Amino acid sequence: MSYLGVGVSPGNVPVYHGTNLKVVDRRVRLAELVLRCVICGLGILAAVLVGTDTQVKVIFTIQKKAKFTDMKALVFLVIANGIAAAYSLIQGLRCVVSMVRGSVLFSKPLAWAIFSGDQVIAYLTLAAVAAAAQSSVFGEFGQPELQWMKICNMYGKFCNQVGEGIVSAVGVSLSMVILSGISAFSLFRLYGGNKGTSGGRW
């Protein structure tokens, strides 16, 4: 019997046959390409929204300017999303080339490299979102015990734009988590029986 083009042996061990493997690989590669395009777009959007965010407030004739570099968590968020966007662009181009060539991923070292890279970027973006979200909570509600002011009461526009950037960054993180699952599937299926011989290497 088969499911999604994957043959199943009597011992319930998945066996990927040559033609079926190419069909599955094409579907996986298409889903991967879509996700990488989403990550690239949202990553750039998040970095631009946060990185260009400034607001000037005049307090008793003194100008106070809020910018993303005032909070290290936001700097981390911009850098992490910039890295994620660049990485996804490179990997997206790899997907396009392999789809045009009609090749199937048989190289275990390459599969391990993609899997490891996706894991690193996923953890990086999740950490950046968590740090930025925590800093944003402090900016919105303050910390009375430490006498930290509610910064967003003074810099409303700045905080709103940061919030939009964080929402975009959350989309990047969730997409990277899903993409990590896809790259894990692409890697570990190479250890699941006969990989077949048809199709080019990539």
UniProtKB/Swiss-Prot annotation:
The keyword Transmembrane helix applies. It is a multi-pass membrane protein. Pfam families: CASP_dom. InterPro entries: CASP/CASPL, CASP_dom. Residues 1-29, 94-109, 186-202 are cytoplasmic. It is found in: Cell membrane. Keywords: Cell membrane, Membrane, Transmembrane, Transmembrane helix. It comes from the Eukaryota. Residues 51-72, 131-164 are extracellular. One of its GO terms (cellular component) is plasma membrane. The chain crosses the membrane at residues 30-50, 73-93, 110-130, 165-185. NCBIfam families: A_tha_TIGR01569. Belongs to the Casparian strip membrane proteins (CASP) family. Homodimer and heterodimers. This is CASP-like protein 2B1. It comes from Vitis vinifera (Grape).
